[in-house]
Amino acid sequence: MTRNVTLLTFVLLTASPILAQVLSSTDAATKLRALFDEDWQWVLQQYPEAATMLGDNRFNDRLTDYSTEAIERRKAHERDMLDRIQKINRSELKGQDVISYDLFLQDKKLNVDGLRFPTEYMPIDQMNGVQIGFGQLVGSTPFRSAKDYDAYIARLSAFPAQIDQLIA
């Protein structure tokens, strides 16, 4: 009996730190993946045309909001994501999660640093802008049901407002 208690005590004492480290690592990895998912869903929602081109049809009835308020929300989101990724303890991550962490952190640093250059004042150039993207969007838009057509009509109807936002 004493031998069993001694063995159990030894197992618990050695397993506790290992288990705590595994749980901590899993917690950091879980937080990291949740942050990635939250950011990705935000991007798809903020840029519905991109979502459509990627095959995500949840936002096919919308266009990107270029209002001053929306632009400020996107800037705040980038700052928030940078702050939140830095709160995840990188040393608790392993393997691919470390690489993903580093890439995401670098991306968010570049995005926040780039906010110094207000690209919203030049939304159209010879390579990019609604004058090009809107016409190309139809090639990625599904037209399999009446709902698909209704979504596209809603998008067409929103186009003048989007142009007004870009002019403002």
Regions picked out by a protein language model, each given a short descriptive name:
Residues M1-L8:
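Bacterial N-terminal signal peptides that target proteins for export
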Residues A15-P17:
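N-terminal signal peptide c-region/cleavage motif recognized by signal peptidases
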Residues V22-A168:
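Non-catalytic accessory/assembly modules
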